[in-house]
Amino acid sequence: PYFLVGKYNPKAKYQVSLIGKGVLFDTGGYSLKSPAGMETMKTDMSGAASAWGVINIVARTNQDIGLTVYTPIVENMVSGSAIRPGDVLKTRNGKTIEVMNTDAEGRLIMSDALAYAAETNPDLICDIATLTGASVVALGLDIGATFSNNNDLEKKFIECAKSIKEEFHPLPLFDGYRKLIDSDLADMKNTGGRFGGAITAALLLKEFIGENDWIHLDIAGPARSDNRKGATGFGVLSLYEFFKNLD
């Protein structure tokens, strides 16, 4: 595993932290995917790739904001040192997570990255990830999901995305579902059952953002749409358009 950090314009007045999920290949671990389910899993690092794409464009166009990118880089494989169902992990901010399903690994690596970013108290934390199949069930292959604790910023992001012809739709960050990830052994568990999976994943991430404004982008569908060959780069231009209009 690696944890890559990149900084642009760290002395700017407005500072943004951008976290990208970087699972280079996802077998599901001991909660093993089917062979068909693994076919596109080399694109499970689309969030990390997008994050680096965004900072590249921001730097090349000399934007006034400060941007720090954090990308945890792993593979989710079966091995003698792999995490197991039932393991309890202690995260960077001290909270503990019971692993119920090793195929819900993205939120585990992103929890530490979010906590690390939150320690710097940026003006805004964004994350982008191929996080849940539930978001694909809800929105299909062409629409990304947004979750946020700041409705005004979320609305502005969605408008910026529409202006460059990418579609995002807000999903509810419904605190009533927090109980679905309660654990008897830890502060939370990494899955919340069959229903509302995109929401419970977002609620887990919310545990690691501190008091910061935050937008979570779940791009599991459009990042690897069947409508074109390979990964799509979905979200890069939306984030760039959004960041250049922040103040």
Segments predicted by a language model, with ranges:
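A generic structural signal for tightly packed, nonpolar segments enriched in small/aliphatic residues
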Residues: 1-247
